[in-house]
A protein has these predicted regions:
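Short amphipathic alpha-helix that is part of the acyltransferase structural core
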Residues: 1-29, 33
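Conserved beta-hairpin
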Residues: 28-45
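Acyl-donor binding region in acyl/amide transferases
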Residues: 35-37, 48-127, 132-135
Length: 136
């Protein structure tokens, strides 16, 4: 399924991300969505201040992606590219995202992002190891 970019209201993007990740991104800067040919939103990306304090240097943004949950396969690498371009045009020099090790990071790979670090599981979140991915 191919997607095209559509604007999304901040509150709608946050609600979608909260349903998937159970956490609201803080310090939101922008959001963008991907819709199918029928105009239905399939995936959302929210760019915000990094959750890791060491990355919160004023020049880095973190992007959280969330599928709407329709069950259909989604090709959202255009969202990765759009977020990178938007962040660059706003003056940010680094863009990162996290991918759980039990999930595929093929979308990030197809968009040219690369894994730069692995993070151990956080206390209270179960045995979830994540990889830090960085935009080119």
């Amino acid at each position: 399924m191919s997607l095209h970019l559509v604007p999304v209201r901040d509150r709608d993007a946050v609600r979608t991300v909260r349903l998937r990740h159970r956490r609201t991104p803080r310090g939101r800067v922008f959001a963008v969505a991907g819709a199918d040919d029928d105009g239905r939103v399939r995936t959302v990306a929210v760019a915000h201040r990094p959750t890791a304090g060491l990355l919160d240097d004023g020049t880095t943004l973190e992007v959280t992606f969330a599928d709407v949950g329709t069950g259909a396969p989604v090709e959202d690498s255009p969202l990765y590219t759009a977020c990178r371009r938007a962040a660059e045009s706003l003056g940010y020099t680094r863009l990162v995202t996290y991918a759980r090790d039990d999930e595929s990071a093929a979308r990030a790979r197809r968009a040219g992002w690369r894994a730069s670090a692995r993070r151990r599981a956080r206390p209270g979140e179960g045995p979830v190891v994540v990889s830090l991915w960085q935009a080119p």
